[in-house]
Amino acid sequence: ITQARLDGSYVMDTGSINFGIESRSMESTSLQSLTRHTMGNWGIENPGELPAGSLTPLDLASEFSDFNTEGMFSQGFTGSVAQIGAFAAQEYGFDFLANNPFATNRTIEEDITAVYFELDLSGELNGMEYNLLAGVRYENTDVTSIANISLPSGIAWEGNNDFNVRFGSDMEDVEVESSYDHVLPALDFDIEVVENMIARFSYSKTIARPTYNNLSAAATVSPQSGPTILTDSITATASSGNPSLIPLESDNLDLSFEYYFDETSYVSVGFYDKRVKNFIGNEQVEENIFGLRDVTNGPRAEAARAELEARGIPINDTSLFNMVAAMENGIEYDSLTDEQFEQQFDVLPNSEDPLITFINSKPVNNKAANIYGFELAAQHFFGDSGFGVLANYTTVQGDIGFDNDANPSITQFALVGLSDTANLILMYEKDALQARIAYNWRDKFLDTTSQYINEPGYTEDYSQIDFNVSYDITEDLTVSFEGINITDENIRRHGRTSAMLWKLDELGARYALGVRYKF
């Protein structure tokens, strides 16, 4: 990041006029490479074939003692990838972790020029004290997305339902430029309408720029999960960025009333409304990418299926792969085991195979939404005792939710991360000792609309108790002790219904002892 900024101010009796200019340049580079060696099939079929100590049995269910894990797949193995890889390299005669070139080299350049003007005033209006902060900011942004990518040479069929994207040595540069500008006004006004009661009004227009991942000019492909000749339900997928994305724009309105019934005690109520446009949604397009071809749906796959039918052999992923490999290499179908076919042969696409139709998901600015709610808060200290209490509750509503009863094949846009929250804090602050214990709660919320393709993911309602105690030994030296989630609460995530478990998080309690010294 390279940044230059110049600010100025003209001071008056009732306030000031502030102004400035800014230039900011940012560059983000992402490098990615993949080395893959397929050793055996899914899971561990014959762990005894590996050197002693390479694998350790793992009871997965026992790792989640706070949950009912009945019916959960419980037995697994864990081990050292480096140790197993080194053994396999020596056993089968290949180099472990070959030095492949970077398959993807992506750079995003963002150049921002801004100028602002601000008026800061304080005074009285009909005997009521007020504060006014009003201004406007203009920003111009130029975006350049550069991708230097290794072109895929083909998708190899390495086993029944095992596929691997292989890359050639050719690299290709893709560069896309875009630009946008915004005028961003802002107004904050508060006035003491009666003694100890303050009314606040705020309006602003803000932006949130797309993430760099969404601005990539390159596409990433993922092979299908099985032979497409056997079913129409299996598809290959791809994802790509969109360098022409523009920021989210939000018109924000906030109203609140605060009543101070003591020097450190108050109650407040507020309303907020945010009108947001240019939300990023995913658009799915059926298209071929990089000229890649489907080895599982061409003449060789058709001939293998016909041969299996003629012999009366059940047709599935494994038998089809074995027959294609046998016919292509001139060996008998029954001469090798399934494992030997997988270990000895890969089937590569050729010009007679059909082009793969990928379902390419790319981000686009295509949605708008409204977010609104209320905020209630209160704080009170009990005389000079040092004891106090703070409580707040925030409601969040949105006009676009996820329809769990909709057709799963339809991509839905919905606002994520919206839920009511509440906090209750008991405090002690006197002399050199400060202590707080807090109860924090968050209601159930939608956290993703694409947990798997078009499936939603919900985080269930959750609460935890935290505490913090600190003591000022001197003005400069402070010791502290804190505990987070001291009652050992856990997080559970599910899909369209609570029965569709996605994820369990056993968080546990965390404690920290700290020392801080100010120089």
Regions found by a protein language model. Give the residues of each.
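Flexible glycine-rich, low-complexity coil/linker segments exposed to the extracellular/periplasmic environment
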Residues: 1, 43-102, 160-172, 229-240, ...
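Transmembrane beta-strands of outer-membrane beta-barrel pores
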Residues: 12-14, 21-29, 136-144, 203-209, ...
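Repeated loop/turn-to-beta-strand initiation elements of outer-membrane beta-barrel proteins
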Residues: 15-17, 126-130, 196-199, 264-267, ...
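C-terminal beta-signal and adjacent terminal beta-strands/loops
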Residues: 41-44, 277, 441-449, 470-519
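Gram-negative outer-membrane beta-barrel transporters
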Residues: 273-275, 285, 291-450, 487
